[in-house]
Amino acid sequence: LVLDPTLLLTNDIWERVFPIRNMFNERYVLYYRLLRNSFNEKQVADFAQRLGCKLLILEGRPRPTIKKDTISSANPIEFISLIKYADFIFTSSYHGMVFSLIFHKQFFASFSENSDRAESLLTSLDLKDHLIPHKSDIPTHIRKIDYTSIGLKINSLRSLSEKFLKESI
């Protein structure tokens, strides 16, 4: 397994390379919606409310937006910033999940199909319970991600990936 190139950089490097800043002055849960209806929006809104957070929806594909607190598109710096400063993330995007890992965020991911690489990565990190079947209810019990242990696993996978890439050149 070679990590996705996004994971070859640490969060420190991402923060040095990009001018990441908090775009909102309040706590929020981010729902990065690449696929429509990956999560029940009402359940996500209730979840955000229980955390005492605003719900922000980031559309993965530009769409005409009429709903309040919906962002129709974001450039790469805005995308990374939205993830870094979120209190919790719901995503139907592989890279939404990866950046959640990079910035040590609590998250749930859901994919309708082609979830093999997400499932493989989350299994290798012992986080498969954070991969929710498409259109399933949000679990009531959430196992908090221990990023001390996850960081060690990602660093180990990063080292193996770098070694493989160097030996392949």
Descriptions of predicted regions:
Residues 1-169:
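Active-site anion-handling motifs in enzyme catalytic cores
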